[in-house]
Amino acid sequence: MSNQYNIDVDKLKEKAIEIYNEVYAPKFGDKYLQDFIDEVIKYCLNLLQNRELNNDSTQSEKLHDITVKNILSPTYNGKAIEALAQARTIGEFDPLSRIIKIQGINIFSPNSVKTIGVGTAKIFRYAVTAFTKLNHPNTPSNKIKLRVYLDLNDYAQANGQDITLSEKRRNFRRKIKNDLEKLKQAGVSGEEKIQGKPRRYVGLNYIGKYDIKGDSIMVEFTLGMAEYLVSLPMISYPRSLYSLSDNDANTFAMAEILCRQNSIDNNVLRGTHGRLRIETILKYLSFPTYDELQEKNNIRRWREYVKSPFENCLEKLYQCGFLKDYRYAHDGGGAELTDEEAANINSYGEFVSLILWYELNGFDDTATRAKAITEKRAEKMKKLTQARRKKKSNTDNQ
């Protein structure tokens, strides 16, 4: 690896090992150590290039913060998972059936819509990420590892919680237990396109069992949920999102949508992975629609009810380290709005028609990602071609 910034790579490796031993070694041993070191060096050189880290910062606490906060983890992602994050923002609860309806996904909740919140979505996402490490895509049913173990201290750190004091630790454990109980009781039904084919699922329980002993959290997925998970595509999920407040459902739902858009391979190849129409994002948030504003005679206060809270969400995502940059642009050519133009948007319609351009921390540049995707697809096609030729050769020789 080139080192045009005269950075002391050996000291950087030492710091990376120190961070790994503190955060990840208790769970994974040395299994991911070298991958972690490589990612830290690549990430820090990228920060140096963008002047976000000084050369003398390689031994500082800043390295610890940016590394742990922005670490990316591959995780399975589908509508049944995203629905948990959207239950508090756009979920419609039917008290008779005890079902939360979320854009074609139905979650049966034995109590009420308020039982499914950001904390519930976060612990499930955290468990799915651990499951992803154990089970590769399309793992046969009889080989799926259903049980994962999570570290209480690591999860607390990811959430930005200091649980050193015994009372705080008890409260944090109690909250996790409550969220896991909700997941055990909740069932999800819906239909989505997976690997190009429509797939329907009915009454899948999110988890089957859980247990918390000491600092270890055991989560066991049901076989049905596990089979669903290994059929899904993966996204790269930033650790920084766990630090968002459990009380801020809109910011969390926005982050998950931006993360999904950024992780789709075809979007990267088309160059659309870092932009979304504001109108599209608003469909997943609980801000009032145009019709709702008109109905309550509040259309003139659209900035107060929509634009300001929308921008507050963006700022929180920037502050937590998820967003590297964001800006508004006009549709089509993508001409960026100046600060003055952004401040003087005249109407609700004009605002929602804008495009949000954004960059996420921790990801390679577009060209590097596109090259990696193209090479991966070419390798996959090569293997498929070789397999077909081998099969044909065996048939011809019979």
Where are these regions (language model features)?
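Charged, alpha-helix-forming regions
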Residues: 1-398
